[in-house]
Amino acid sequence: MYQLFCFLAGIIVVYKAAQYYKRRTLVTKFHCKPARISPNKSWLEYLGIASVVHADEMIRKGGLYSEIDGRFKSLDVSTFKSITLGKTTYVTKDIENIRHILSATEMNSWNLGARPIALRPFIGDGIFASEGQSWKHSRIMLRPVFAKEHVKQITSMEPYVQLLIKIIKNHEGEPLEFQTLAHLFTIDYSTDFLLGESCDSLKDFLGEESNSTLDTSLRLAFASQFNKTQQQMTIRFMLGKLAFLMYPKSFQYSIQMQKDFVDVYIDRVVGMSEEELNNHPKSYVLLYQLARQTKNRDILQDELMSILLAGRDTTASLLTFLFFELSHHPEVFNKLKEEIERHFPDVESVTFGTIQRCDYLQWCINETMRLHPSVPFNFRTAANDTVIPRGGGKSCTDPILVHKGEQVLFSFYSVNREEKYFGTNTDKFAPERWSESLRRTEFIPFSAGPRACLGQQLPRVEASYVTIRLLQTFHGLHNASKQYPPNRVVAATMRLTDGCNVCFI
């Protein structure tokens, strides 16, 4: 027994010595220096359970991203170190660090950490929860779906825009909660684009008869359970590796209802021949394109749930905050309306190409995504001992050694408020800041590197089309809430806590 103990102790000593030597070699080679440490403000933070105890409050008040931004300012750094129960997390808004971590050359040095644990009940091994060969396979399958020729199918949005306009006209001149309508529009168009048939939530809002072939109770349950799932998924993200603690029956029910909804459409395509798939009138639909590559039900379900999760809320968030800002900046609204009237005299003139050429519209969209990023932060976990290029030493410009298992969280919310990147008054909504010909490489609303969003053109095109059509139809927009800047909340994406209360006239 004594000999076994000595043998095991010897192995540990050798391992620790080798680990120490390797780390010292990295420190010497890259001239690494320690980062500034952010002190814990309470014993809950030190124990690492503040995010658990205050999870609901942080979600409702958007506390996490504003708390991070406040620490950057109080420490006067772009990268700081946080220690909780001996576990280290580096938090950065330095774009050089972010681009380094997300680059292709660093893919083997970083992994998704606890993200797969948080997402797996909902999207299984879909593209947002997979790594390595599984992720590469997902990306190869999905890339053709988001090719420009499919994104250009903008006329397929018009029926849902017509329903949106009808709802607004029913409340013309009255306060209207636009955030809800933005989510109804995007869930309708997303299900049409992904599955080939809309869930008709806008028609339900209007009290009109649905054209869906689905059972009414299943269709209604799908739309209502979607928001509940996202709220609970946010808490799972905050719990990290303890996400398994957040798995109540209500969460399981919400997920199952959404999978049952998607499975109806999967059942249909699994039974279709290759000829039927190729000749289908909606050949651009994601499900049909995936079914040409595989009939594996699990793969189809995981990828559909992944894209549905990402596609629906990103566009809804962008539309919500764009119209919120336009309602509080009448001079921007008036200028944008003039530009739209000049570029788009009628519905037929709205094409993928003309949308791209309307500069002021694109400036407004960029400024909205800068000020209100739909995903305000992201993170990676070191797969082995590695180095990030900046943030260490007294000058905060030296490299930092990151040990295996340590996490780096990067705040796009804070990056987008850096004056050295985006000019003065970065808390102000100012589309004209995008008029400079210099390309802002620091602006990465859809991430960067190999894992950059495949469908990043889609929310831009959707938001552009809806904005054009609404400004073609209505001549004025007023805010029905004086709260500015707004209270924001992070669910799957950033949202307005009190909704987007506006008046169209």
Curated annotation (Swiss-Prot):
The name this protein goes by in its record: Cytochrome P450 52C1
EC number, as in UniProt: 1.14.14.-
Transmembrane regions: 4-21
Induction field: By various alkanes.
Cofactor(s) in the UniProt record: heme
A Pfam family that the UniProt record links to this protein: p450
Disulfides per UniProt: none
Protein function: Together with an NADPH cytochrome P450 the enzyme system catalyzes the terminal hydroxylation as the first step in the assimilation of alkanes and fatty acids.
Key words of the record: Heme, Iron, Membrane, Metal-binding, Monooxygenase, Oxidoreductase, Transmembrane, Transmembrane helix
GO molecular function, one term: oxidoreductase activity, acting on paired donors, with incorporation or reduction of molecular oxygen, reduced flavin or flavoprotein as one donor, and incorporation of one atom of oxygen
Cellular component annotations (GO), alphabetically ordered: membrane
Coarse class of the protein's main subcellular location: membrane
InterPro entries found in the cross-reference section: Cyt_P450, Cyt_P450_CS, Cyt_P450_E_CYP52_ascomycetes, Cyt_P450_E_CYP52_fungi, Cyt_P450_E_grp-II, Cyt_P450_sf
Protein's cellular compartments: Membrane
The UniProt record lists the keyword Cell membrane: no
Family (UniProt): Belongs to the cytochrome P450 family.
